[in-house]
From Swiss-Prot:
Pfam families linked: URO-D (PF01208)
Protein name: Uroporphyrinogen decarboxylase
Subcellular location, record wording: Cytoplasm
Species of the source: Orientia tsutsugamushi (strain Ikeda)
The keyword Lyase is annotated on this UniProt entry: yes
Subunit structure: Homodimer.
Length: 342
């Protein structure tokens, strides 16, 4: 049993596991070297051998407790035939689908997305059994926002989406994407993932009612379906920006773990631990600091608050490309050598 699975089961409270979102990526020189051997980001994602190598790079360097497969939430719409482009300093961007009704006609192109599962299989065979392998997907709502032409620069605006698309059409589209998402996660589990994480990056823009319909309901459906087939698999949800709705999400989706963004106060995370394992929430900007004391104080504060219960140390969002490697090394050392003052 991996150390992270032990954390879910509360069977090893003397050890806090650690991994970082986007831990395999641009801040690593070894990643930069490998990236130069491919023509595009997605070419790297769809090369099983190279994607597996990238996935394992941060494990070799930092001894993280989990590997997360090197991929992207947009491989799913890409495999449906929606044109995805990688734009420098912006990342993967989907070409806006002309009409959401067209989404119903699209079929998965297995030749593309199956490469992700091949990479997972390679990683699982090379990865120490004490390490977990995390598969992931985008939440159906978040994937839908990209299909509608939004991205990290042109951020989704709920009222704009609502005025341009009928509520029933949005729900139908989310239902279609939910089915594809379940298939995608099932295939990752069959390939060797023992944990999956659902990244709902744009959950936080939704009002209460739509949050329930567009985020909680499909996530609950995903969790229920996966648990029926794979009861041993752990599922982490990440409804970024959900604020007070983190509690509603955790209770109603039945996720095993809840990943928290850096805007959620630690005392709220402490409350969430009553219903699930919590993960997070160090601000990625904090670890850009040249002052090691600032980093140390932030890490210790999180550990003091959360490490006595079900907890995985992580960031509140993905690691930034300009992050100094020495700062990551410091955090790993602090977490692994931490001893509670209680």
């Amino acid at each position: 049993m991996s150390k992270i699975i032990q954390a879910f089961n509360s069977s090893n409270r003397n050890y806090t596991p650690i991994w970082f979102m986007r831990q395999a990526g641009r801040y690593l020189p070894e990643y930069q070297m490998l990236r130069k051997t491919t023509n595009s980001f997605f070419e790297l994602c769809y090369d099983p051998i190279k994607a597996a190598e990238v996935t394992l790079q941060p494990i070799a360097r930092f001894d993280f407790d989990a590997a997360i497969i090197f991929s992207d939430i947009l491989v799913l719409p890409d495999s449906l035939g929606i044109n995805i482009r990688f734009i420098n300093n912006l990342g993967p961007t989907a070409e806006k689908i002309p009409n959401l009704l067209d989404l119903q006609k699209l079929k998965i192109q297995n030749t593309k997305i199956s490469k992700v599962y091949e990479a997972i299989d390679i990683v699982r065979k090379k990865l120490n059994k004490q390490k977990s392998l995390i598969g992931f997907c985008g939440g159906p709502w978040t994937v839908l926002t990209y299909i509608l032409g939004y991205n990290s620069r042109n951020t989704p605006k709920f009222q704009e989406i609502k005025s341009n698309n009928k509520h029933e059409l949005i729900l139908d589209s989310i239902n279609i994407l939910t089915k594809h998402t379940i298939d995608h996660l099932e295939n990752q589990i069959l390939a060797g993932a023992d944990i999956v994480q659902i990244f709902d990056s744009w959950a936080g823009i939704l009002p209460y009612q739509e949050f329930s319909e567009y985020v909680i309901k499909p996530t609950s459906n995903i969790v229920k379906t996966l648990k029926e087939k794979f009861p041993h698999i752990k599922i982490i949800g990440f409804p970024k920006g959900a604020g007070k709705l983190y509690h509603k999400y955790t209770k109603e989706t039945n996720v095993d773990g809840i990943s928290c963004d850096y805007n959620l106060p630690l005392n709220e995370m402490l409350k969430l631990q009553k219903n699930a394992l919590v993960q997070g929430n160090l601000n990625p900007n904090t670890i850009l600091s040249e002052d090691s004391k600032i980093i140390e104080e932030s890490v210790i504060k999180i550990m003091d608050t959360l490490s006595n219960n079900r907890f995985i140390f992580n960031l509140g969002h993905g690691i930034l490309p300009e992050t100094p490697i020495k700062n990551v090394e410091l955090i790993v050392k602090l977490v692994k050598n931490y001893h509670s003052s209680e």
